[in-house]
Amino acid sequence: IGALLISSGLFTACDTDFENPNNPTEDVVLGTKEGLFALATGIRQYYSVTALRQVIEAPGITTRELGVTNTFLNINELAKGGAELPGESGGITNPWVNLLRAKGMAESLIEGANTVELSPGTRSGVIAYGNLFKAMSLGALIEMFEQAPINNFADGAAEFSDRATVLANCISLLEEARDMMSSSPVSDEFKSTVLWPEMNLQKTVNAFLSRYYLLAGNYTESITAANAVLNDSDATNSMWVYDANNQNPIWNRTVNSADLNPQTNFGLLGAYVPEAGDGRVNFYLGDDAGFANGDAGGQALSEMLGFFGTNTASIPIYLKGEMLLNKAEAFARQSQLSDAVIQLNLVRQKNDDPLSVNANLPAWTGNETSQADILEEIYKNRCIELFLTGMRFEDSKRFHPNFVVPTAANTTNERNRNYYPYPTVERENNPNTPADPSI
């Protein structure tokens, strides 16, 4: 698998490939069923250990979920944000490079599935799996960057697309995955060789469809996809699983290395501070853990628990609570306020979550006729329920689009950037790199 991961470098947007005579050639990897299965397994390992860290860490620092406890320049630059976050910062280069690599591996898998002779059920499994990983990688990129390349180019000169186009492509990939699995159910061969017991591919595709439909403003479709997850007869919770050799990447950055720690109260201030008795606080956060660096804000920190407390703790690929909150927001934005409050209260009153993310609070007592108030309560619950899922950066921009982010460094606002500048390594190697966003 390691060789496959190394060889995948030739599929990134900027050309960083180095010849290694011990690596299988691209033709060997993509030309056999066994090679495709090995690549699929390699994608899972790379994404869950390497790319997922970047999906969670950079947005988590930008939106005050995580506090910085060392003097490493890259994460301190993220904590300050504003104009002090330069294109050469590793804090934004790492997400860019890692997600492009994961996306390139998925593109190679999809290409191979269309050329290698496979049974219909195996082909649908390989393509659905590849489409899912490409959509996840693209979605994470467009939540951090104003534009992103939909397809990697071998010469490094990938073309960029705007947010709406990228989201539409994510949706198209996932719709194709959903429809292929419906017309040609995934084969037992693919399930037993590539998938793992904690993975329901169909539910996961629908969960990400619900997410990206919501971001694109396709509210009815988001509700339908969320219902497909919530009403699925299979109780499997799709999880990234870890062992001693492939360790939980957020545990590794918090508990193990203490470079970062969760901010107390999830970094929320004022009206967004969790209510007394909210069970999600004690699920995710432990005892007081000191303070962040003064230059990074000096915020109060807590011990890491939840899905990141041990080196082998599994991380959910999506949460049931996200599906409920997606429905709540979609109803609210369509002015179906009573339906929105019903879904919101399902989250607030939840005490039987399959992964123990239980607020166990009473029903909301706010103004049920105010769309603005309902949306604010949904935002607050997304910040708590979906802690360290990589979603808060996107959520902050969607719920508070008129918030003016200062150009000066800031460690107290709910976000200190709207989008990241494009990494210098991309700009120096790709003439198609757009101008940086203003903030």
Regions found by a protein language model. Name each.
Residues C14-D15, I171-S184, Q202-V241:
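Aromatic-residue-lined binding/catalytic grooves and analogous aromatic/hydrophobic interfacial grooves
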Residues F37, L73-F145, D155, E159-A164, ...:
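Conserved, well-structured interaction surfaces
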Residues I75-A79, G217-L324, N351-W364, Q371, ...:
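Hydrophobic-face positions in mid-chain alpha helices that act as interaction patches
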Residues C14-T62, A226, L355, P401-I439:
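Membrane-proximal, proline-rich intrinsically disordered regions
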